[in-house]
């Protein structure tokens, strides 16, 4: 009976799940082990088999449903359909049938054969379900990320199209644990059932910001006989006309010395083919001297690089291009030109940190995909000379700047290892560094993530009541005052092109000092006061004692002199983002409490009847603040916000972002972001080799901030002055400068745009 039952239903053995079979075997063995009677086994087996047959029949009925086809005892993970909330591939763009043609390129075949590529392809090769989502192309069990796709090539009138991509290749089984995955070019040739479906597929790729290279029919390209051209489509399908984007124009500035001379090979062998696939029109210029990239960026015709400037090299060439763009005759043009980065140097901290790109192929793909990432810029101004230099990564003083200076001697001999050699030599003969540091702390954020404004002494309601009381007696100001206030908040092109006085002042420029928006309103309202000679009180610390501290010019003359004087672009340029000024506080200190000069003309030249003793006054010396309670109540006290540090420092680093190094674990400023409007200042207090060695050892693992002598502060402006017997040098984004006197670093929010989309915030 048992044998006949098994023979009649041979499929039962396959239908029974493995888990249930093991349970039945255990039950059968337990019966034999317990010495059960033989008459129990023929009674038990038919009942269990009948139940299993019924269960299998029910399962067969369920699987016959065309909508639900679950397999028994199988875990399913639906990543493309079903529940929309569990869709991991984004929204659906287009779906249909496709066949992957794995044959080699048919470029050498006859055009007629290309026109009908193996008419039996669809019948012989089974077409699979394919769909294009906002994140990937899925066909069968294969998937291709859209971030890896460069372009799509399509010949008019054909059923096939080619997808050009650079996916991450899988290493061999034995070496995959030791080698990093690399990207390589792969061309996927798909065949659609009809020409119309092929056009729809290509148009869908165009909707996902993929470059469409639409070519004419092969017969038209080869100029076949006119009799054959009557049946050949010539015009581009209307679905693809608007998807075919115009070729972007970019200027490529290549530093042939970057990366120990390998930047040329990286560009021509790796990056240039990707740009050509994407249809980018390039003009490649190789730098020949220091500062060549800055000259190109400051004088290049904007029509030649309307879509951006690509920098191939390290952080040094990027810094030159940035300073060239921001010192153009029209600064608005400089801000509008984005910068693309291809890492090919020994240090590329900017692109590693902001865009999360570490290899040239990924950098080229991010440039091809487009997108813009706004980045803050900091300005370093030399107070004595008025020279301004911009940066986007970090400015450093002390041991690191000395290592940078010493490494220039070993650049040709050691290449990227020159920093290690110079650091070791400088470590063995470590000097003592002393600095005077004053910084303006950034405003803290509350629990809701909004900036919490500090309580100020100005009561705007009382100020409004006071102004209305005087206006009822003297009349409202003229309508031109509104335009004057608006001109301060949004400077015109003419104002942007102007620079400051030819004589270098001891005070920082307006946007470097970070004037507060309320102070601008107060100064704008004070312009109706009669022009009077002003006397600046002598200060405790005068940076230039040879210059007299008395000025007989009126506020009007002083303001216009700063706006109309013309000087070289790099020196005391008054250009700056007003949005960045509005977010910053005034940077006057106790040691330098001079008044704020009005930067605009007076509204009236005739005397006004306003009470001079009750006029709205700007912050003045401490003697003026103590003269009356009313003046003290309406004058913001910004001197108390500045914090001073003086003593020995092994190093001072002012970071604009996290500043990741070659090793991903090395993060100089973990809490800094490229677009938060603040800078992170690291102070390494003290002196001695042991402290310096501990700092660099813990820097390898990102635990250097736990040291008791390391201080990290978020700041908006920093003043640094080297002490006596201290080697006065500083580095800005890998460029070395001499530190003569005091310098001030100030943040300019979102004054540069990088080509590419930034990933999520780094933890």
Curated annotation (Swiss-Prot):
Tissue: Expressed in roots, stems, leaves and at higher levels in flowers.
Binding site residues for substrate: 313-316
Gene Ontology MF annotations: ATP binding; D-erythro-sphingosine kinase activity
GO cellular component: membrane
BP GO annotations: sphingolipid biosynthetic process
Biased segments, Basic and acidic residues type: 58-81
The protein's Enzyme Commission number: 2.7.-.-
Signal peptide location: none
Region (Disordered): 34-81, 561-603
Active site: 315
Keyword Transcription regulation: no
DAGKc domain ranges (all copies): 245-384
Alphabetized UniProt keyword annotations: ATP-binding, Kinase, Nucleotide-binding, Transferase
Job of this protein: Involved in the production of sphingolipid metabolites. Active on sphingosine, phytosphingosine (PHS, 4-hydroxysphinganine), D-erythro-dihydrosphingosine, D-erythro-sphingosine and trans-4, trans-8-sphingadienine, an LCB found exclusively in plants, but not on N-acetyl-dihydrosphingosine (C2-dihydroceramide) and D-threo-dihydrosphingosine.
Protein name as it appears in the record: Sphingoid long-chain bases kinase 1
